[in-house]
């Protein structure tokens, strides 16, 4: 006992001295920590769902648990397991905690899984302890990953509780950024508000408890799950200096604590952070990442998550400035509409991502949401040398979530192109589009092929293709793709530019009667994902969308400013070309302007067709005509071109807005609060439903359709494949 107190006194004395100048013990600890921060190759994040959704058919033993996602990592290129003991929502954990809430309940919905946590606790252990011991026994590190504001509990409703919604949030709704009735525009209402000292203190205590009670090598503070930390930001603002400083002081406090614990146990605890890869974006969200690096509060920065904003060189340069290792974060792709021939989740794609990241100068790679611990690429991507002789795929875009989902105007920070089947680019005759593609440093040693997937284009000669200024010829059509050989000596390490131009429009399927490009006959409810590209870009409130008498009944029963039930379509139109929109509907109710309407934005101008019980109006042009819109269905035909807009009702011209289509679609004051980061749809989209927050409205819709003289085809995807001269077997 005497020896113990002497040790505690020595540590306390050294820490007191640290306030004036670091002691030799602390300097040694920091030097060891700095050295350790540069030793790993691959960090593998395990989200903890192996315990939360444990297969009922398996025995409740540590060994059976480890076989799910950990055992196969031994001997691979993975050097560190970062284990997340759920932390969803804030305060829920599957490790043994006295401060948080132990999550032992089963998650309803599957008879094939159950929560293993209670079984392991009865056996004197828990998921984090089991994984930590396994990692150390197999020569790997173990970090504990805390999701700093996970909102997988966002499906919670007061009348329908969600199992991941913690008691803390139910007991302290004042800790939350919003409420079920007052949802923010950016992020989830169930996020906790880090502007509050009480929330920051809880986060600190959760982290401190693990550092004191588990023999972990480091902690991962996952700020990407999820990027909502301040009420001011979630409701459309930017973080203030005071708010940022509050979170920064939390980081400082965590660093001090890890050094205290490190001195007590004689071994440092590393701090890693998972954050956006652009410091300015993170700054506005409330995370002063550059300050944390400058002050020495973090040891490793892992960049990107739902989106990558900049090429890796941007974050690498920041790391070098502050002497902090930088890791490229590889999240699993979630792109919809991919073709099975060339996919972002393939082994070849992970190789390409790694090759490119190493070429950019990263210090390591971080793997997120990969559930197969035996995945082949985990034994291939740990070094550039291991990757060099292997086939690869290079996509311009891997993840396509919107930065504006968490920060108003956040899309402006995106310089990495967003080109996916669900985010196509328009190809037109006479105008080339340039697609940047980032490629690793080994592509020149074998063969390279450019693969292009363009809607209805089956003739390779229909496209004029140049890569870094070199014309690509001799293309072939292969399984819905156009393949063009790319001379290896014309492939550059790093940024490459592919230019595509239509020589002529392809033969297209016969248009719908009337020449309509897109037609939604409202005899069914659109369902995700088959509905795409139609989207509902509003927070669910008191609204109804259902079939009634063969028509779509869409009703806004809420007076919340953000309650705007609608369907929107990202049409490809040009303001200088004629666009015709037609809708057939019967008004049921409208007690305010725009409670039932069509919104038409062509990239230059925006206008509403406002349907009221006794009139139809062009909102901005202030043109109106009397009409009983409730007794029967009417067909409204809107024609737009340049600055002209006209409306016909049941085939007869009713409103003439010649020269009055002039309200700018680019000015944010004319924008609606579209969610999920799609605020840019305000500039160019077709929208029907409600655009009035305070008002209530409902209508029966029979059809919505449009045709345009703008002629283009969709560039749906693009990828570069590289193959070495020889392909050796992968080694572990």
Where are these regions (language model features)?
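Catalytic domains of carbohydrate-active enzymes, especially glycoside hydrolases
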Residues: 64-91, 213-218, 297-303, 359-364
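Secretory/extracellular carbohydrate-interaction modules
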Residues: 548-620, 708
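Ligand-recognition surfaces built from glycine- and aromatic
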Residues: 514-518, 661-732
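Extracellular glycan-recognition surfaces and repeat-rich motifs
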Residues: 516-517, 521-557
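Beta-strand-rich ligand-recognition modules
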Residues: 454-512, 621-633, 657-680, 711
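Short tryptophan-centered beta-strand motifs in secreted/extracellular beta-sheet-rich domains
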Residues: 142, 581-583, 632-640, 645-649
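Active-site neighborhood of glycoside hydrolase catalytic domains
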Residues: 198-323, 349
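Active-site-adjacent "subsite" loops/lids of carbohydrate-active enzymes
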Residues: 35-59, 111-133, 143-209, 213, ...
């Amino acid at each position: 006992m005497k020896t113990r107190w002497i040790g505690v006194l020595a540590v306390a004395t050294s820490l007191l001295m640290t306030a004036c100048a670091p002691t030799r013990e602390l300097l040694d600890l920091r030097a060891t920590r700095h050295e350790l921060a540069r030793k790993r190759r691959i960090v593998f994040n395990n989200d903890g769902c192996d315990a939360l959704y444990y297969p009922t058919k398996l025995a409740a033993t540590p060994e059976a648990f480890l076989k799910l996602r950990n055992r196969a990592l031994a001997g691979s290129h993975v050097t560190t397991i970062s284990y997340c003991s759920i932390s969803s929502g804030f305060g829920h954990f599957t490790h043994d905690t006295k401060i948080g809430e132990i999550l032992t309940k089963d998650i309803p919905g599957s008879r094939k899984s159950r929560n293993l946590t209670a079984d392991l606790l009865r056996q004197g252990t828990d998921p984090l302890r089991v994984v930590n011991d396994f990692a150390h026994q197999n020569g790997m590190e173990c970090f504990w990953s805390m999701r700093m504001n996970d909102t997988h509990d966002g499906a919670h409703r007061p009348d329908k509780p969600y199992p991941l919604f913690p008691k803390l949030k139910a007991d302290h709704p004042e800790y939350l950024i919003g409420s079920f009735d007052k949802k923010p525009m950016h992020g989830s209402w169930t996020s906790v508000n880090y502007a509050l000292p009480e929330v920051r203190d809880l986060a600190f205590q959760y982290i401190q408890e693990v550092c004191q009670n588990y023999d972990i090598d480091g902690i991962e503070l996952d700020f990407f799950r999820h990027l909502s930390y301040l009420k001011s930001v979630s409701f459309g603002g930017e973080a203030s200096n005071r708010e940022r400083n509050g979170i920064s002081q939390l980081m400082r406090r965590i660093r001090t604590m890890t050094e205290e614990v490190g001195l007590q146990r004689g071994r440092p605890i590393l701090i890693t952070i998972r954050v956006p890869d652009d410091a300015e974006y993170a700054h506005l969200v409330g995370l002063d990442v550059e300050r944390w690096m400058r002050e020495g509060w973090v040891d490793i920065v892992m960049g990107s998550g739902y989106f990558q904003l900049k090429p890796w060189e941007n974050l690498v340069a920041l790391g070098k400035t502050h002497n902090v290792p930088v890791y490229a974060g590889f999240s699993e792709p979630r792109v919809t509409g991919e073709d099975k021939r060339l996919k972002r989740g393939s082994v070849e794609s992970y190789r390409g991502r790694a090759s490119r990241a190493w070429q950019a100068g990263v210090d390591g790679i971080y793997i997120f949401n990969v559930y197969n611990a035996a995945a082949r690429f985990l034994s291939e991507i740990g070094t550039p040398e291991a990757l060099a002789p292997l086939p690869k795929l290079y996509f311009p875009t891997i993840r396509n979530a919107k930065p504006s989902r968490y920060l108003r105007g956040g899309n402006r920070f995106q310089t990495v192109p967003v080109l996916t089947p669900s985010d196509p680019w328009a190809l037109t005759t006479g105008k080339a589009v340039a697609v940047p593609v980032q490629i690793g440093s080994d592509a020149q040693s074998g063969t390279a092929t450019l693969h292009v997937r363009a809607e209805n284009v089956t003739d390779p000669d229909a496209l004029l293709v140049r890569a870094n200024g070199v014309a690509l010829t001799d293309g072939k059509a292969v399984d819905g793709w156009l393949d063009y050989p790319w001379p290896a000596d014309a492939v550059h390490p790093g940024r490459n530019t592919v230019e595509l131009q239509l020589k002529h429009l392809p033969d297209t399927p016969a248009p719908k009667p009337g020449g309509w490009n897109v037609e939604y006959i409202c005899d069914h409810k659109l369902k995700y994902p088959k509905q795409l590209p139609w989207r509902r870009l509003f927070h669910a409130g008191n609204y109804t969308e259902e079939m009634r008498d063969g028509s779509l009944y869409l009703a806004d029963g809420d007076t919340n400013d953000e309650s705007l039930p609608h369907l929107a379509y990202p049409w490809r139109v040009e303001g200088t070309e004629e666009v015709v929109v037609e809708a057939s509907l019967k008004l049921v109710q409208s007690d305010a302007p725009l409670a039932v309407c069509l919104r038409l934005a062509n990239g230059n101008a925006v206008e509403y067709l406002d349907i009221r019980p006794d009139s139809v109006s062009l909102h901005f042009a202030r043109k109106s005509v009397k009409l009983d819109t409730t007794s029967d269905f009417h067909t409204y035909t809107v024609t737009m071109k340049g600055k002209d807009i006209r409306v016909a009702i049941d085939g007869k011209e009713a409103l003439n807005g010649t020269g009055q289509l002039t309200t700018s679609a680019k000015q944010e004051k004319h924008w609606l609060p579209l969610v999920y980061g799609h605020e840019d749809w305000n500039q160019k989209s077709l929208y029907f439903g409600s655009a009035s927050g305070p008002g209530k409205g409902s209508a029966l819709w029979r059809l919505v359709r449009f045709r345009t003289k703008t002629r283009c085809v969709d560039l749906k995807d693009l990828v570069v494949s590289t193959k070495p001269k020889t392909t050796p077997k992968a080694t572990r």
